[in-house]
Amino acid sequence: MRLALSFLRLLPPEISHFIALHALKILYKANLISLLFPHNNSSESFQFKGLTFKNRLGIAAGLDKNGDFLDSLGALGFGFIEVGTITPKPQPGNPKPRVFRFTDQEAIVNRLGFNNKGVDYLVKRVKGREYNGVLGINIGANKDSIGQKRVDDYIECFQKVSAYADYITVNISSPNTPGLRSLHSKENFLPLFKAISHVRETENFSNPIFIKLSPDEHIDVISEITKAI
C-alpha cells in the first residue's frame, strides 16, 4: 500500500485522483475492499436534521462529482456521501493544470471549476446505485449562466435530483465559477432562495437543504443570508 501511495505522489495530482478512484472501483467489483480495507461498525450512529448517519465520517462533494464511485466509496464504510457539484449541462471545468499538491503543507488546492458530466448523467448513476447510506447531492450553475439563467440552473438540478437525494446542497461558494459568489449579496440571494423554496414545495421535498457559502465570507454577509433564510 505504501509503495502504491508513493507511486501516486510522483504523478500529477489530478491523474493520481483518477487512478485511485478507478482502482477502488476495480477492487469493489472484485469483492476485495472488505479484505484490504477492513472496518468495523462499532461507531455510534446519530441523527441530524431527521437523517440517521451510521457514523460521523463522510465524503464531501468534489471527490465523486458524477456518482461514478458511489458503491466503491460506500463499501469503505462512510457515514454519508455527497456527490457533485453537478450542473445542468456537462462542462469541462478550468484548463489544466488545475489541481496543485503542496507536500510540505500536506495540502492539495483545486481550481477545477465545476467539471462534471451534467445532471442527467448523475441521475442515471444514483438511480442504479447499490449504496444505501445517506446520499447528499450538491448542485450548482453552469459557468456561462448569468442572471436569471443562473437561478434557473439551480432549479433544474433541484427538480431532477430531488427524488434521489437525502439532502441537497446549494453551492454558491465556488471561487472558480466567475460571478458565482455574487449570489452572496442580498439582492441576488433572495431571488434564488425564493425559487428554491418554491420548487421545494412543488416537488414535495421534505429533506434538508443546505447552502454552501464561501468559508472566508464576511460575517455581516453571512448574517444577512441567515436572516433571509
How would you label these PLM feature ranges?
Residues M1-I229:
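Flavin-dependent oxidoreductase catalytic cores
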